[in-house]
Amino acid sequence: YLEDKYTQTSFRPVDHYVRGQMRAFLVFVDVWPTPAVRTPSFQFGGLLEKFIAMSDKKFLSLIKKRPLKTEFYLSFDKNTGFTTEQIFNSFTVILRTIKRMDAMLTKFGGPWLMGQEYTLADIAVLPLIDRMQDLGLDGLWEEPYPSISKWLYKAQRRPATLKSYFQGSRLSEQFPKIVKGPGSLSEWTNKYFQVYRGNPQSRS
């Protein structure tokens, strides 16, 4: 809507092939990493704490009020959260996203996902990668995919991003006793890579 209404600055590639690739990536982001990031957000982001404090009756009442999220809320234990397998499954989806982003940066030459221009592809996936870094799970890409760290650093310093992520908007600022920021959950990312023989490239 915003892209169509405010045409002064376009965030869609001019080249039709590149634009098609961007659209395919937008569908991918909606279907895979967007739902997947909920798991670590609830488990490590302080969001689980409010459920732990609830009675079972109140928790079930909350579920009834949010029918679109019923399946998600019933997928974890309100007192302990998600299983390690569920958490690792979410990591696999995020890592698949990282791998795809890395390939796009290589294919289109960077510095942005679709090439020289910042597009809807960057805008769509930035909140997911920023959230994972804020949770302390940036170990998923820091070593195996340094291109993502460079991309994220650049994207986070755009004026529009700085306005969007105002002071107090990140989970590490809302729940500082729980969420410690970049690198703080390295034991989880290290364990994940150990389980999968330290070869993130094989998890596609």
Spans of model-derived segments:
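Long, positively charged, glycine-interspersed low-complexity recognition regions
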Residues: 144-204
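GST-like fold's C-terminal all-alpha helical module
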Residues: 31-153, 157
